[in-house]
């Protein structure tokens, strides 16, 4: 499709985001990012407010392929919204970006939005933030370690799980600390012990 495609054709691509077949959705948003990125991005951000779950989830997936272009607009959308569903969708879009582009440099504004999401009143937003930070990887390590040591058990379990495959020395030190602390929540402790065993097994295989 040529870059000069009409608005009508772009409207058709947005209609395709509501298609029940994920393949049709994927083809639509890949076409958007290739040929209509500037026109599509604002409309995709608006779709995060959509009541139709299929379209909203498709918008999250679509924003994931916009990578750097979507980072700052998503942060602005997150901070501006009073709707927990919209905020969760912004966070999930960050997870999609990080999953699609491993090692991508996340700007300070986006990291600040994810950190704010950790303290969101909505449990869905808060847990989604941990999962997104897990996708971000090493850049998010300090935040994830804070969450592991935090008082929110559900978030701590999610953070430990996100870091379970890491053999970074700071992660190992945190897990060892949690495994011996009397105040560690039983569910967190169980996850930590399992993760330490996984790291030990990984090191044995690599030896």
Range-by-range predicted roles:
Residues 10-11, 25-26, 41, 71-72, ...:
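Residue-level signal for cytosolic alpha-helical hairpin/rod architecture
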